[in-house]
C-alpha cells in the first residue's frame, strides 16, 4: 500500500504582511488534512519595496528580480521553521507549492506577476518546488484568479445545500459551492486592503488590530454610496481585481479632506461587508451558510458588519468548523495545487476564472 505524502504550501497575499506556510497530508490527489503552520512577517523595509513596485518606476526589472530572491529566502526560512516544528526533513516532503507575491494583476492584458525565484527556493529548501500557478489559467483565457474555488470545492462542498466560502485577505473573494454543479467564484472587491492602507497612512500602524480604530467611528452614508457605485461591482463574473483598481489614491478621490479618520475607517469596513453581501445575494441567492477564512475574520467590526448586512438570510461560520484553521486555508490551497501538479490533476477552477478548459496549474523545479 502506497504511503501518504506530505506537501508544503506557501502563501503571501495582497495584504503583504508576511508569508504563511502550511504542512498538508495527501493520499495522491485526496486531501487528508493540514498538520502544521509557520508564519514569517515581512520586515517593514521589504514591505515598502514591494509596495513601491506596485507603481511604475525606474529600474523595475532589476528591482523585481532582487525582490524575488529576497522573498524566496524568506519563504525558505518559513519552510525550514515549519519542518523544524514538525520534526521533519526536506526529504520527507513530496513537493512545495509557492504562490509568490503579487505585484501586478492585469488579466485584461493576459498576465499576472507573482514575485518568487522558484529555482532558488528549490535550491534553498532542497524540496521539489511548484509555482507560477496563475499563468496557465491566463493562457487559457482565464482571469488567473481566484484559484481557490477548486480547493474549496474539494474540501468544503455539501451535497445537500449551497455553501459559500469567503476569503478576506487584502482582496475579498467568494467560492460558491452548489450541490451537483461546478463551483465558481470571483473577487468581490477590497477586503482588508483599503482599511490597512488607511490605518497605515493615518496611524502609522500596519493594520487596525481587532477593529479598535474603526469601532470609534461612524459610517458616512454619502461616502459609502459613492464607493459602492464603482463599476466593478456591477460587472458580471468571472472577474478579479487588485491594488490596480482599489488603492488608497482611488479612495482619496472621494474625500474632501475634512472627514474624521475614524469615520472613514468605519465606512471602509462597511464597504467591504456590503460588497460581499451584494455579491453573494446576486451569485448565490439560495445560500444559507457562509464559511469565512483569511485575516479579516480577526476583525470583530468587519464581522459585525457582515452579520448586519446579511441579517438572518445567511449564517456566518469560521472554516475552523470544517476542520481547517481560517489562517491556514490559502497556504493549504497551494500545497493542494502542488499535489495536483504532481498527480497530473487539473486544479484550475475554470468556471470561476473563465478559462476555456481545466488546466494543470504551475511549473515545477527540481533542486
Swiss-Prot record:
One of this protein's Pfam families, by short name?
Answer: AnmK
Q: Where does ATP bind?
A: 13-20
Pathway assignment:
Amino-sugar metabolism; 1,6-anhydro-N-acetylmuramate degradation; Cell wall biogenesis; peptidoglycan recycling
The reaction(s) this protein catalyses: 1,6-anhydro-N-acetyl-beta-muramate + ATP + H2O = N-acetyl-D-muramate 6-phosphate + ADP + H(+)
What EC number(s) does this enzyme carry? 2.7.1.170
Keywords, sorted A to Z: ATP-binding, Carbohydrate metabolism, Kinase, Nucleotide-binding, Transferase
For this protein, the record's Gene3D superfamilies field holds: 3.30.420.40
Q: Name one GO molecular function term.
A: phosphotransferase activity, alcohol group as acceptor
A single GO BP term for this record reads:
peptidoglycan turnover
Its annotated function is as follows: Catalyzes the specific phosphorylation of 1,6-anhydro-N-acetylmuramic acid (anhMurNAc) with the simultaneous cleavage of the 1,6-anhydro ring, generating MurNAc-6-P. Is required for the utilization of anhMurNAc either imported from the medium or derived from its own cell wall murein, and thus plays a role in cell wall recycling.
Q: Which family does it belong to?
A: Belongs to the anhydro-N-acetylmuramic acid kinase family.
Alphabetical list of HAMAP family matching this protein:
AnhMurNAc_kinase
Q: Which PANTHER family match?
A: ANHYDRO-N-ACETYLMURAMIC ACID KINASE
Its recorded name reads Anhydro-N-acetylmuramic acid kinase
Q: What is the lineage of its organism?
A: Bacteria, Pseudomonadati, Pseudomonadota, Betaproteobacteria, Neisseriales
Q: Which gene encodes it?
A: anmK
Amino acid at each position: 500500500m502506497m504511503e501518504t505524502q506530505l506537501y508544503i504550501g506557501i502563501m503571501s497575499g495582497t495584504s503583504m504582511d508576511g508569508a504563511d506556510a502550511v504542512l498538508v497530508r495527501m493520499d495522491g490527489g485526496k486531501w487528508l488534512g493540514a498538520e502544521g503552520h509557520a508564519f514569517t512577517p515581512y520586515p517593514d523595509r521589504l514591505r515598502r519595496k514591494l509596495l513601491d513596485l506596485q507603481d511604475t518606476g525606474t529600474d523595475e526589472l532589476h528591482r523585481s528580480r532582487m525582490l524575488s530572491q529576497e522573498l524566496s529566502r524568506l519563504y525558505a526560512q518559513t519552510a525550514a521553521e515549519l519542518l523544524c516544528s514538525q520534526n521533519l526533513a526536506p526529504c520527507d516532503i513530496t513537493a512545495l507549492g509557492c504562490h509568490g507575491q503579487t505585484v501586478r494583476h492585469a488579466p485584461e492584458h493576459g498576465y499576472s506577476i507573482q514575485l518568487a525565484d522558484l529555482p532558488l527556493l528549490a535550491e534553498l529548501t532542497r524540496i521539489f518546488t511548484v509555482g507560477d500557478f496563475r499563468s496557465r489559467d491566463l493562457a487559457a483565457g482565464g482571469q488567473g484568479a481566484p484559484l481557490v474555488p477548486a480547493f474549496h470545492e474539494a474540501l468544503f462542498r455539501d451535497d445537500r445545500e449551497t455553501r459559500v466560502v469567503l476569503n478576506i485577505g487584502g482582496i475579498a473573494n467568494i467560492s460558491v459551492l452548489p450541490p451537483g454543479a461546478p463551483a465558481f467564484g470571483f473577487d468581490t472587491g477590497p477586503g482588508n486592503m483599503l482599511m490597512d492602507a488607511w490605518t497605515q497612512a493615518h496611524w502609522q500602524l500596519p493594520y487596525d488590530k481587532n477593529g479598535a480604530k474603526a469601532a470609534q467611528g461612524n459610517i458616512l452614508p454619502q461616502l459609502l454610496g459613492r464607493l459602492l457605485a464603482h463599476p466593478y461591482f456591477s460587472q458580471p463574473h468571472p472577474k478579479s481585481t487588485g491594488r490596480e483598481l482599489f488603492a488608497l489614491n482611488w479612495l482619496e478621490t472621494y474625500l474632501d479632506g475634512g472627514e474624521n479618520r475614524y469615520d472613514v475607517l468605519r465606512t471602509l469596513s462597511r464597504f467591504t461587508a456590503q460588497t460581499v453581501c451584494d455579491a453573494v445575494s446576486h451569485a448565490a441567492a439560495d445560500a444559507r451558510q457562509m464559511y469565512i477564512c483569511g485575516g479579516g475574520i480577526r476583525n470583530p467590526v468587519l464581522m459585525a458588519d457582515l452579520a448586519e448586512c446579511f441579517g438572518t438570510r445567511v449564517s456566518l461560520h469560521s472554516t475552523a468548523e470544517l476542520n481547517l484553521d481560517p489562517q491556514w486555508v490559502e497556504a493549504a490551497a497551494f500545497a493542494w495545487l502542488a499535489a495536483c501538479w504532481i498527480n497530473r490533476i487539473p486544479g484550475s477552477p475554470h468556471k470561476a476564472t473563465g478559462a476555456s478548459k481545466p488546466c494543470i496549474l504551475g511549473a515545477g523545479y527540481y533542486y
